[in-house]
């Protein structure tokens, strides 16, 4: 998993509350269990004027000219500014996969759905909760400023705006450690590989019948 320390990223808006995981990545794209291939269909029902299908070439599809992520000013955005209860709905892990592959490494909102919030950390995305008034002020500044970039400092736990305003955020120490080190569940397990190997070797000595090859 990619590590996260500081991010100086262009911000883009998702200016609606209660964005659910089906809107983030529609159900017809959930057939794959691979982590890749979902970014092209992130917010598919909002980005395009027709219905997307798995394996379809998106280059010829009609785009929605009113959807902000289709605006040139938000190309390459890595910070998503959202409203309350972002990521509600089903617990599909494909949602953070799609956001990450599209290029979003941080999401700022007044609140998140719990399962989505946890899944973000497991996939290298930093979800930041800020007061609703602060989020509103960020939306106002972003709409007024083309090329609006936010500096996300995970070690210091701050979000800094182009105007110099800095806002602190809370993050669980263990989750912070995992993001800083780029550790997902597999990475955490591999940190104890020597201990696991030693345990298995000792267990094989004590109960060899469990490890005997079947004839």
UniProtKB/Swiss-Prot annotation:
Organism of origin: Saccharophagus degradans (strain 2-40 / ATCC 43961 / DSM 17024)
Gene name of this polypeptide: leuD
Subunit structure: Heterodimer of LeuC and LeuD.
Biological process according to GO: L-leucine biosynthetic process
CDD domains according to UniProt: IPMI_Swivel
Protein name (database record): 3-isopropylmalate dehydratase small subunit
Domain of life assignment: Bacteria
EC number(s) from the headed UniProt entry: 4.2.1.33
Pfam families: Aconitase_C
